[in-house]
Amino acid sequence: MKIAVIGLGNMGQPIARNVLQAGYELTVYNRTKQKTEDLVTEGAQAADTPRLAAKSADIVITMLADDDSVSTVTFGEDGLLEGLAENGIHISMSTISVEFSEKLAAAHAEKGQFFLAAPVLGRPDAAAKAALRIITAGPAEAKQAAKPLLDSLSQQIFDVGEESKTANAAKISINFLLVSMLEALSESFLMMEKYGLEQKQFLEIASALFGSPVYQNYGTIMAEQKFEPAGFKMSLGLKDTNLALAAAKRVSANLPLAELAKSHFESGIEKGFGDLDWAALIKCIK
């Protein structure tokens, strides 16, 4: 089976490498061609356009920042939609909006292709270890065909049905939970700091009670002030918070915590923190 990976950022690069290591023929595309060089050295082929990348593949994975980025590589004369063969599969591993997921599913169906939403849970280090968790939704035939590939990239797969938007809504909700935890952890750290307790010691207490890798990992980043290099940028945290608010509005749900986190992210970005890890939320509350 031939695979193409489009988007070689912090997540796309290790995902592409794991595709190679799993023994698949790999074609890669990235807007900045320099990012393809190491993978080409390791055995991948580089394509000049998304269309050419898709033309050489049975399955195309996109791992990009947002709706606009995925739209750019999918639609248009040089988009993957024009290159992918009938019955080909587009797997979007990006965090995209519910509405855009529906648009992609419809566009591929019109071409006789399959669209599979497969957003991931995990940071770049998890991607490098093929230890991501993946939420999938889409046609059963596509999920069955893609399962061996997704198994080679992950430690666990959650199948949430045949409508792609369900997987994207689930990922958006998970990210909202993470934002809520970052908000609560930041506020707790700052309060205890005023009572003279070091953040590392408070984290030890919290970790003993909750036993959550989220608290442990992000709490350590906060306590040690190691916000660079960013595993997930604050600007992307704001993007995902806005996605959560939009998804909630669509079904008349209220997310007051998301509104609060949004204001803090916006404040941080105004202060120049947009490229820091989103755990730098703690710097936005001080």
Swiss-Prot record:
GO terms for molecular function: NAD binding; NADP binding; oxidoreductase activity. One of its GO terms (biological process) is organic acid catabolic process. NAD(+) binds at residues 4-18, 95, 239. InterPro entries: 6-PGluconate_DH-like_C_sf, 6PGD_dom2, 6PGDH_NADP-bd, HIBADH-like_NADP-bd, HIBADH-related, HIBADH-related_NP60_sf, NAD(P)-bd_dom_sf. It is an enzyme of class 1 (oxidoreductase). The keyword Nucleotide-binding does not apply. The keyword NAD applies. It holds the Pfam family NAD_binding_11. Gene3D superfamilies: N-(1-d-carboxylethyl)-l-norvaline Dehydrogenase, domain 2, NAD(P)-binding Rossmann-like Domain. The active site is at K171. Keywords: NAD, Oxidoreductase. Its EC number is 1.1.-.-. Belongs to the HIBADH-related family. This is Uncharacterized oxidoreductase YfjR. It comes from Bacillus subtilis (strain 168). The lineage of its organism: Bacteria, Bacillati, Bacillota, Bacilli, Bacillales. The gene is yfjR.
